[in-house]
Amino acid sequence: MSATLEDSPRLASTEVAVKLDGVRKVYGRGDRAVTALDGLDLRVAPGEFVCLLGASGCGKSTLLNLVAGLDKPSAGSIELNTSRPAVMFQEAALMPWLTAARNVELPLRLAGFGRADRRAKAAELLELVRLGGVGAKRPHELSGGMRQRVALARALAATLRVDGADAPALLLMDEPFAALDAITRDVMQGELLRIYRSTGTAVLFVTHDVREAVRLGQRVVLLSSRPGKVVREWAGSPGVEDAELTDEITARLREVISSHAAG
């Protein structure tokens, strides 16, 4: 099967924001080849919050890179019906010489927005993440949680289009809160849910934390150990601390890890 990944979003279905069919990703060749993903199928609906869980090395980050267009699948197809995906990583990766507002403006500038529009939209997004008063500050003047809020505002800015077209937005998040302390992480999870509900952005969120996945996801998807493929899905209730569901998913994750170790 040949690999296909469109340079510009292609209509898959009015009810599908992201569609992956039989996706395979192999690094290297011959005896040194490593298969990160194999036969992975996944759907994300417009405005849906999907959490990806799995053991280290199962291909979660690889999957995000493929959806973002940062890499190409070795086989299978990936179809998007969204604006260009925005990516948020564990590190905020803000430009240290730019203010918070200018960091948020950067993707808008690259997208062709005029100066006045950039400033207005950056101010609006900083207000959305509750940082309306820090636009003039540089990253070193902000706490870790505040820097991640700025990074979130910048990611949301990256989903905007200068032509004003109302394409569904897609946010790809690779363990964005993993480096934060427990209290700040809890606050950021709540803030992300608030922003998600107010914007209707589809989210594909990678995490190792089962509790985080259950709290955030409308759907929790478990990947097998490498090579990664979907082995189980659960429906979630965002904002709800469901101890029973957390225990069930944790037990299944342990089974996946144990079976891989035994093999």
Segments predicted by a language model, with ranges:
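Conserved ABC transporter NBD signature motif
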Residues: 75-85, 121
